[in-house]
Amino acid sequence: MTADNNSMPHGAVSSYAKLVQNQTPEDILEEFPEIIPLQQRPNTRSSETSNDESGETCFSGHDEEQIKLMNENCIVLDWDDNAIGAGTKKVCHLMENIEKGLLHRAFSVFIFNEQGELLLQQRATEKITFPDLWTNTCCSHPLCIDDELGLKGKLDDKIKGAITAAVRKLDHELGIPEDETKTRGKFHFLNRIHYMAPSNEPWGEHEIDYILFYKINAKENLTVNPNVNEVRDFKWVSPNDLKTMFADPSYKFTPWFKIICENYLFNWWEQLDDLSEVENDRQIHRML
């Protein structure tokens, strides 16, 4: 499936979308001096700056392990999903920066078993952004390193980078061994979604999110052994189970998961046996 590179709902262009669209790479690097230009990036997973020693109030009361993870180097983007440089997870998730248009790359994985059930997780209480909320199997960020960046700049290379990051994070968050992920199923790239959402103060999200389905092979399973610092709970659900959860006010969901469900998920789910009509959409779907 192919399409134009950009899509806005109902043809609408918000003032925020215009702000992000009009920023050049030079504008981004000037506005955010913490961003390391792509050619000068250290090719390391994390910044050498220690959030633990910063004394910043934005981390007051938060879990030490989660604070360390805020040093990870995310991929800072322009409007067209071109990598501009490396920015720490902290810098990329502060609302004061997001309000100025700072954008980064992310991925969202949806794992389905042989019965067509989707693996959901409830984010741990310790998470700095969107704690305790239910969401899809795994949501995180490719890092600004060679294996996850897509150095050639082509979409297929970026997809490979997102999948490499997904394999890493499925192990880190859910304890799914990397060798199992690589051999017991297959990833399918669906599309990219561009959205912005505030979290708890002072945090938020502004991402181009690579949507990845993963179908477990027939008669096989994946080991799920969650990292309690990342995942509070998990469950396998059918479409009807998920709709029941949405109708129950005791369940709270991440904003990106709600966007994906409201616009795409249930239609995609119906085509799970043959995703050829819906996968590999080259368009960036703007939800701003």
UniProtKB/Swiss-Prot annotation:
Catalytic residues identified in the record: 139, 207
GO terms for cellular component: cytoplasm; cytosol; nucleus; vacuole
Phosphoserine PTM positions: 7
Positions with a binding annotation for Mg(2+): 93, 104, 205, 207
Compositionally biased residues, Polar residues: 40-49
UniProt catalytic activity: isopentenyl diphosphate = dimethylallyl diphosphate
EC number: 5.3.3.2
One GO-annotated biological process of the protein: ergosterol biosynthetic process
Cofactor: Mg(2+)
Activity modulation comment: 3,4-epoxy-l-butenyl diphosphate and 3-(fluoromethyl)-3-butenyl diphosphate (FIPP) act as specific active site-directed inhibitors of IP Pisomerase.
Domain of life: Eukaryota
Gene Ontology MF annotations: isopentenyl-diphosphate delta-isomerase activity; metal ion binding
Metabolic or biological pathway, per its Swiss-Prot or TrEMBL entry: Isoprenoid biosynthesis; dimethylallyl diphosphate biosynthesis; dimethylallyl diphosphate from isopentenyl diphosphate: step 1/1
Chain ranges of the Nudix hydrolase domain: 102-259
Coiled coil segments of this chain: none
Effect upon mutating residue 138 to S/V: 10-fold reduction in activity
Enzyme class: isomerase
Keyword DNA damage (UniProt): no
Annotated binding of substrate, by residue: 89, 123, 127, 140
Family: Belongs to the IPP isomerase type 1 family.
UniProt xrefs under PANTHER family: ISOPENTENYL-DIPHOSPHATE DELTA-ISOMERASE (PTHR10885:SF0)
UniProt protein name: Isopentenyl-diphosphate delta-isomerase
Organism (species): Saccharomyces cerevisiae (strain ATCC 204508 / S288c) (Baker's yeast)
